[in-house]
Structures are given as structure tokens and as C-alpha cells.
A protein has these predicted regions:
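Primary recognition of N-terminal secretory signal peptides and signal-anchoring hydrophobic helices
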Residues: 25-173, 178
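Charged helix-capping and loop-helix junction motifs
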Residues: 269-275, 304-308
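Substrate-binding clefts and substrate-entry loops adjacent to catalytic sites
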Residues: 288-303
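C-terminal motif of bacterial Sec signal peptides marking the signal peptidase cleavage site
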Residues: 19-22
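Short, well-structured secondary-structure segments
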Residues: 176-179, 213-217, 231-232, 250, ...
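C-terminal active-site subregion of NodB/CE4 polysaccharide deacetylases
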Residues: 165-233, 239-240, 299-386
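Acidic (Asp/Glu)-rich catalytic clusters
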Residues: 208, 246-254, 271-289, 342-343, ...
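Bacterial N-terminal signal peptides that target proteins for export
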Residues: 2-10
């Protein structure tokens, strides 16, 4: 019995020793600690899209972003508007501003006001930050800068443009105005209407070499800046105004005004709409109205005259994005009704041949010197000196 007990104890001891040896020789598996789950990355709330408004053109420049509708008003990019005006933006103390003509206008994101000449003008809704730019109500901005607004209902397009009628023009300045028509050696119709390109070039050289300043009617508001202002006008909008006249204007860097008959654009021997736009965008050519169909204004009823004035005005606005301010009367004819209606649509009315023009005279009857095919450089110079 004792032997069996010893034997049993021996077995137990051997088994315990074996188990102890096995545990000592076997490495324990490391216990892995799970890494903490990172918190989810917050997803930025997307900026709500504002309803797109109508296309907007400012002084002939289309705003790339157009307009948006915010609180029932049309808003435009403050930065784009300034760029369209050719104004330089600056920022100080969080206020973004630009200077245009004699007015400094500014805005601050989130502020319920615009600033004009340092004075705050309250807005119905605050300045909106949208697409990383400041958006402001276009109507208020135009009113502060005295920029007119014209809405083209047919094409749902808004034009912001300055009319000469809003300017104060200094009085008593002598400004010779010259009337041309075609510029070509290929004469057709009435020969006297077509000046040879070589003769016109001599006339342009004379102007440049003798210190004359060819300007537009739009420049009369600052006429005192020019020593010898002169206005060159070309009636009817013939095709040669693009093929022969335009290259000469570019060569001598001279400004000119072309009076187009808008209903005849694209016709044989007349400018195309695309050519009109190209010349306007060059910065050398002002496009003004010669009515829509060249009918004698003094023979038309009042409503017919309105149609001639308004339709040609709209046609030019669509081509250039800038409101025309001058009407050239077909054949120089204008009735009392014409003169009464003119200020509703234009700031200047231009007749045919006459005497030198002085600022301050009746702007509805601007007189011009007639340059024909037979006008020599000497005769041209004499007209300048009268």
C-alpha cells in the first residue's frame, strides 16, 4: 500500500515537473491591444447654390459669373464689377474697395451696407460671400456710381452703362467735328462720299504731327484735358470702314466714331455685326446710331421716329454692351418733333455740314465739316484752323 502511494506521488511529481518545464520553455503569445478608432473627419457642409440670375454686361464687358438671386434681388460679384470698369481693387481693414471716376465705393463681407466716399449706405440684405467673392446688389451699386441700367426683356439681359447725359460737359471749348462716309478707291454710287485711303492717311498724319487729339463724343465730359480736340465721324457703316479705315486708325492710334444704320448691317457693302463688335472692342472706334433704316426723320410721325431711335439704340447695345449716346440724323434732317424726342434716347444729335462746334451749344444740333473725295490735306487743315 505504501509502495503504491509512493509510486503515485512519483508520477504526480514527474507530471508536475514536466508541466513546469513545458511552461518555462514556451513563450507566451503577446496580448494585442486594439488601436483606438480615430474620430470621423468632419465633412464640410457644401455652400448652398444660389439661383442663377440674368447675364450682366458692364460698360461693354460681360461679367463671367453673371448674377445670382439673393433675397429677391440680383447680386453680382463686386470684384468682377470693378474689373469690368477697369478699376483697381484694394483692401484695408477688411473693406474691399475701388475708385472709379471720382467715387470710391467699398464693401465688407457680412456687412449690411455699401460705402460711397466713406459714407455707409444701408442695404436690405448684407453683403454676401459667395464663391470666395463679395456679392452685392447690382441696382444699389449702379445707383451709387450713377451708372444707368437697361434690361433687354427679349433676351433677358441686364446692361449697366453710362450715358453722356449724366455728365457735366465744360462749356466754350472749340471742337471741330468732321463728317466722312466711305474710305476706298473703289467708288460706287455718289463718288464724293468716298475718300481715298491715301488721302485719309495724309489727313491722319497731319492730325498726329500737329498735336491734335482725336476724341469721341463720350470724351467731351473731360474736354479740358485735350489741347486740340477733334472728332472724326463716318456715316452709314460701309464695309470699307473695316477693310480700309480701321487699319489706318490702328496704324496711327487714332479714335473715330462710326454711325451705323443698324438694319443694314450684314448687307452687301455694309459692315457685319461681328466687324462692328471687333472695332468697338479695339478701343479706337465708338459705335453710334444713324437710325435703323435711314429714313428722313422730318417726314416721320412721332411713333415712327421713336421706333427708329429706340430700335437702333437697342441693336447697338446688344452688339457692344454700351449704350449709344449720339444720333446722326439721316441726311441731316430733323423736325421739331425730332428735337423734342431726342433727349429721351440720346444726348447728342448730329447734323451734316456746317460750322465748328463749341461745347455748351445745343447738343441736339451738333454741326460738322464735310470731308469729300475732293478735300485736300490743305483744305482739311484750313477747316481745323477756322
Amino acid at each position: 500500500m505504501i509502495n503504491r502511494t509512493k509510486h503515485f506521488l512519483m508520477i504526480v511529481l514527474l507530471l508536475a515537473a514536466f508541466l513546469l518545464c513545458g511552461c518555462a520553455g514556451t513563450a507566451q503569445e503577446p496580448v494585442s491591444t486594439p488601436e483606438p478608432t480615430p474620430p470621423p473627419t468632419p465633412v464640410p457642409t457644401p455652400e448652398p447654390e444660389l439661383p442663377q440670375g440674368d447675364p450682366v454686361t458692364v460698360e461693354g464687358v460681360n461679367l463671367e459669373s453673371g448674377s445670382v438671386v439673393y433675397n429677391d434681388a440680383l447680386y453680382v460679384s463686386f470684384q468682377e464689377f470693378a474689373e469690368a470698369l477697369g478699376a483697381e481693387l484694394s483692401e484695408e481693414e477688411g473693406i474691399l474697395s475701388f475708385l472709379w471716376q471720382d467715387a470710391a465705393v467699398g464693401c465688407k463681407p457680412g456687412n449690411p451696407a455699401l460705402y460711397i466716399r466713406g459714407e455707409a449706405v444701408a442695404l436690405r440684405s448684407p453683403v454676401k460671400t459667395y464663391r470666395n467673392e463679395c456679392y452685392v446688389p447690382v441696382q444699389v451699386l449702379c445707383e451709387l456710381l450713377h451708372i444707368g441700367m437697361f434690361y433687354d426683356e427679349e433676351y433677358a439681359h441686364l446692361y449697366c452703362t453710362v450715358a453722356a447725359g449724366d455728365w457735366q460737359i465744360p462749356e466754350g471749348y472749340k471742337v471741330p467735328v468732321f463728317m466722312y462716309h466711305g474710305v476706298t478707291d473703289e467708288v460706287w454710287g455718289s463718288a464724293e462720299l468716298f475718300v481715298s485711303p491715301s488721302v485719309l492717311e495724309e489727313q491722319l498724319k497731319y492730325l498726329v504731327e500737329n498735336g491734335y487729339d482725336p476724341i469721341w463724343f463720350e470724351d467731351l465730359r473731360e474736354v479740358e484735358k485735350y489741347d486740340k480736340p477733334v472728332i472724326l465721324t463716318f456715316d452709314d457703316g460701309y464695309l470699307d470702314n473695316y477693310t480700309d479705315l480701321f487699319p489706318l486708325l490702328q496704324k496711327y492710334n487714332v479714335k473715330a466714331t462710326i454711325f451705323v444704320i443698324t438694319g443694314w448691317l450684314g448687307g452687301e457693302k455694309y459692315l457685319t455685326p461681328e466687324q462692328v463688335t471687333e472695332m468697338f472692342q479695339s478701343g479706337l472706334v465708338s459705335i453710334q446710331s444713324h437710325t435703323r433704316s435711314h429714313r428722313d426723320m422730318d417726314t416721320l410721325m412721332a411713333d415712327e421716329q421713336r421706333e427708329q431711335m429706340s430700335r437702333s439704340k437697342l441693336d447697338i447695345l446688344r452688339l457692344t454692351g454700351k449704350e449709344p449716346t449720339v444720333l446722326c440724323y439721316p441726311r441731316g434732317l430733323a423736325s421739331n418733333t425730332t428735337l423734342e424726342l431726342l433727349p429721351e434716347y440720346y444726348s447728342f444729335g448730329v447734323k451734316m455740314n456746317g460750322s465748328v462746334y463749341y461745347t455748351g451749344k445745343d447738343p441736339r444740333v451738333v454741326t460738322r465739316y464735310y470731308v469729300t473725295r475732293g478735300t485736300s490735306v490743305e483744305s482739311f487743315a484750313n477747316m481745323l484752323k477756322k
